[in-house]
A protein has these predicted regions:
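Helix-to-loop junction immediately C-terminal to a conserved catalytic motif
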Residues: 21
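ABC ATPase NBD coupling module
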Residues: 38-51, 75, 80-81, 200
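Short helical segment in ABC ATPase nucleotide-binding domains corresponding to the A-loop/adjacent helical element
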Residues: 66-74, 84, 88
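Conserved ABC ATPase "signature" region
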Residues: 81-100
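Conserved catalytic motifs of ABC-family nucleotide-binding domains
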Residues: 126
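Conserved ABC ATPase "signature" C-loop
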Residues: 184-185
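ABC ATPase "signature
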Residues: 190-191, 199, 271
Length: 285
């Protein structure tokens, strides 16, 4: 799963992240990972299970891509052949051909490539958890969107637990299975993206998600498949995996009230209607 910590600057997001791997010791309370109080685990042992991605890529500028990725496995005393295999595996995973990228220096990479190498380094020792402190903040919008998509695909593939810090509610809504809103060092609400949008806690959380585009944000969380109904509609079908936000854009663009829905085999079997989308986006009672 992915948990997004969101809040304004100074709200305590990064501090909480650092408390998870004990870079900062909590003054009270407990932090548990898989039911175990981390206070009873030696810090070095704890951190071997946790990958950490800092703001920016944080790569060593005078080291090659391969050596950067190999940082933690080398510290752990992995065999050279195991390190080489792991570096190659991660480069392939991030669509960076080892023959082309392994020997490059960070300044020879694009911003998006640097970020991918930074995440690969955090995953090199096969951690069970990945902590990410505003990893995409320095990227331009197009590269940032691609990096977010890559993270979602990576999490689905590896099944790891991710905790990501962001000040951007849009990023939190896109990435988080769970969103934790912070202010003044306190957790104000921990809920699914849909609950955060539909039933925000009064005050800071409500202000964070308020706006005329709140219904569109909610539609962007829901696949067409969840609201499609039996029935016929004319025209080119929309894929069931697309979002309701995509569907309403298509409906308005085509000037129609319904679209056929592709069942995954290219055969329209259901439809999505403006009325169904309108009902889904309505403010909760």
């Amino acid at each position: 799963t992915i948990t997004a910590l969101v809040g304004a600057s100074g709200s305590g997001k990064s501090t909480l992240l650092r408390m998870i791997n004990r870079l900062i010791a909590p003054t009270s309370g407990t932090i548990r990972i898989d039911g175990t109080d981390t206070a009873g685990v030696p810090p070095e042992q704890l951190r071997r299970r946790i990958g950490y991605v800092i703001q920016g890529h944080g790569l060593f500028p005078h080291w090659s891509v391969a050596r950067n990725i190999a940082t933690v496995p080398r510290l752990l005393g992995w065999r050279p052949d195991r390190i080489r295999a792991r570096v190659a595996e991660l480069l392939e995973l991030f669509h960076l051909a080892p023959a082309e990228f392994a020997d490059k220096l960070p300044h020879e990479l694009s911003g998006g490539q640097q970020q991918r190498v930074g995440v690969a380094r955090a995953l090199a020792a096969e951690p069970a958890m990945l902590l990410m402190d505003e990893p995409f903040g320095a990227l331009d919008p197009i590269i940032r969107n691609k990096a977010q998509d890559d993270l979602l695909a990576l999490q689905r593939r590896l099944g790891i637990t991710v905790v990501i810090v962001t000040h951007d509610i849009e990023e939190a809504l896109k990435l988080g299975d769970t969103i934790a809103v912070m202010d003044g060092g306190r957790l104000l609400q921990v809920a699914t993206p849909a609950d955060i949008l539909g039933n925000p806690a009064a005050g800071v959380v409500e202000q964070l998600v308020a706006g005329v585009d709140r219904p569109l944000r909610l539609l962007a969380l829901t696949p067409v498949d969840a609201v499609a109904e039996a029935g016929h509609a004319d025209g080119a079908p929309i894929e069931a995996a697309r979002t309701l936000r995509d569907a309403i854009s298509e409906l308005l663009w085509r000037g129609v009230d319904a679209l056929p829905v592709d069942d995954g085999h290219g055969r329209p079997s259901r439809r999505i209607t403006l009325d169904a989308i309108r009902a889904h986006a309505r403010k909760p009672a």
